[in-house]
C-alpha cells in the first residue's frame, strides 16, 4: 500500500534510557560468556553499550518520563495534548491500557484522546502514520507519539545471550503538530509478507497455551528475507512517488547490528558509515528511528527517509 498524505511537523523528541542495574561483570556471568567472546560480539555487532531497566521499571514508567520532559521544560502544556498514542510490544499489562497509566501518572487533561498500539520494530512508523492521519481532523492540533520497550524482561539471557547483550530498553516521546499547508506531502508505503511470520518470530505471550514467555526470533531467516525482498521494495517506493535518492538530506534505515546494515546499504548503493547510535546506545528496537532523528547532528532536516523492517513481516517507508 502506497499513501500520499499531508506532511505534519515533528517539533520535539525526548528519549529516555534506563541506567543498567548490573555491572558488566555481572552481565557476563548472567549470560555465561567470557570477556573475549564479549569483545568479539561487540566487534561483529558494532554495539559497545546497552541499557537495561531494573526489576521495578516498566514501559509506562519510561514513557511517563519521556513525556514529562516536554512538560517540565515548557515545550508543551497538558491541555494542549489533543492526541496521545502509545506504541509498544512490551506493555505493562493488557489492561489497563498504558495510555491510561501515563495519563494518570501525569494528571493529563480529560479531553486528550488516547490510543494504544501493539507495535514491533516498524511500530514507530506505523503509529506515525496514524498520528498524521489524525492531525487532518480539525479538532486535533498537537499530538504526542510515545514508543517504549522493556524487551530485556522478555529475553532469556542464558539461551539468547547475543540479543540480551545487544538490546537496550528505552522510551521516546515525539511531539507532532498540525501543518495547515495541505500541499506539503509525506509518503508512506508498507508491504506485508506473512507466510513465514510464525517461523520468523516464535509466538510470544498472549492467551494461547503454545506461546512463549520470551521473545525469540530467527535472525538468519530475517536477514535472508531482507536481502532478498527489500531492495526491490526500496526502488518501487522511489519510482511510485517519483523520488530520487539524491533529493534526500539523510537516510535513516533501522538495523539491529552494523553487519546487517552494511550489507543492506551495499545492496541499495548507499554510502555506509559505522552506526554510532548502535555503538553508543545498543539496539533500541522501536526507538531506533526516533533516536536517529533526535541525535542528527545537523538538525532541522528538510527532507529525510525513514525505514523499518519487521524481521520478515512488514516492510515500511516514510519520506
Task: Label each region the model flagged.
Residues 10, 55-121, 238-261:
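Conserved beta-ketoacyl condensing-enzyme motif
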Residues 27-29, 98-109, 132-137, 159-166, ...:
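A glycine- and small-aliphatic-rich helix-loop capping segment at beta-alpha/alpha-beta transitions
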Residues 60, 64, 90-91, 109-111, ...:
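Claisen-condensing/thiolase-fold acyl-transfer catalytic domains that form or cleave C-C bonds
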Residues 138-170:
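Flexible, glycine-rich active-site loops centered on histidine and acidic residues
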Residues 212-278:
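A contiguous, well-structured pocket-lining segment that forms one wall/lid of small-molecule binding clefts
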Amino acid at each position: 500500500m502506497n499513501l500520499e498524505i499531508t506532511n505534519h511537523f515533528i517539533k520535539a523528541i525526548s528519549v529516555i534510557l534506563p541506567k543498567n542495574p548490573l555491572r558488566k561483570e555481572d552481565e557476563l556471568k548472567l549470560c555465561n560468556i567470557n570477556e573475549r567472546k564479549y569483545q568479539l560480539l561487540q566487534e561483529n555487532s558494532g554495539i559497545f553499550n546497552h541499557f537495561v531497566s531494573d526489576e521495578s521499571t516498566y514501559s509506562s514508567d519510561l514513557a511517563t518520563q519521556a513525556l514529562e520532559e516536554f512538560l517540565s521544560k515548557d515545550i508543551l502544556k497538558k491541555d494542549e495534548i489533543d492526541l496521545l498514542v502509545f506504541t509498544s510490544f512490551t506493555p505493562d499489562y493488557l489492561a489497563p491500557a498504558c495510555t491510561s497509566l501515563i495519563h494518570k501518572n501525569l494528571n493529563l487533561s480529560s479531553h486528550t484522546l488516547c490510543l494504544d498500539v501493539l507495535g514491533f520494530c516498524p511500530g514507530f512508523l506505523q503509529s506515525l502514520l496514524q498520528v498524521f492521519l489524525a492531525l487532518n481532523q480539525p479538532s486535533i492540533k498537537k499530538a504526542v507519539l510515545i514508543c517504549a520497550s522493556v524487551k530485556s524482561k522478555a529475553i532469556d539471557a542464558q539461551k539468547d545471550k547475543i540479543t540480551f547483550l545487544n538490546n537496550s530498553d528505552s522510551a521516546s516521546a515525539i511531539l507532532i503538530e498540525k501543518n495547515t499547508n495541505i500541499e506539503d506531502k509525506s509518503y508512506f508505503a508498507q508491504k506485508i509478507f506473512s507466510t513465514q511470520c510464525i517461523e520468523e518470530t516464535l509466538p510470544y505471550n498472549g492467551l494461547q497455551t503454545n506461546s512463549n514467555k520470551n521473545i525469540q526470533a530467527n535472525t538468519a531467516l530475517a536477514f535472508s528475507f531482507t536481502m532478498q525482498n527489500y531492495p526491490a521494495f526500496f526502488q518501487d517506493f522511489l519510482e511510485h512517488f517519483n523520488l530520487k535518492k539524491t533529493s534526500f538530506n539523510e537516510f535513516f534505515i533501522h538495523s539491529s547490528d552494523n553487519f546487517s546494515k552494511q550489507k543492506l546499504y551495499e545492496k541499495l548503493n548507499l554510502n555506509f558509515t559505522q552506526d554510532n547510535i548502535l555503538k553508543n546506545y545498543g539496539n533500541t528496537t522501536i526507538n531506533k528511528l526516533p533516536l536517529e532523528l533526535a541525535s542528527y547532528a545537523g538538525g532541522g532536516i528538510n527532507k529525510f527517509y525513514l525505514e523499518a523492517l519487521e524481521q520478515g513481516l512488514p516492510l515500511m517507508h516514510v519520506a
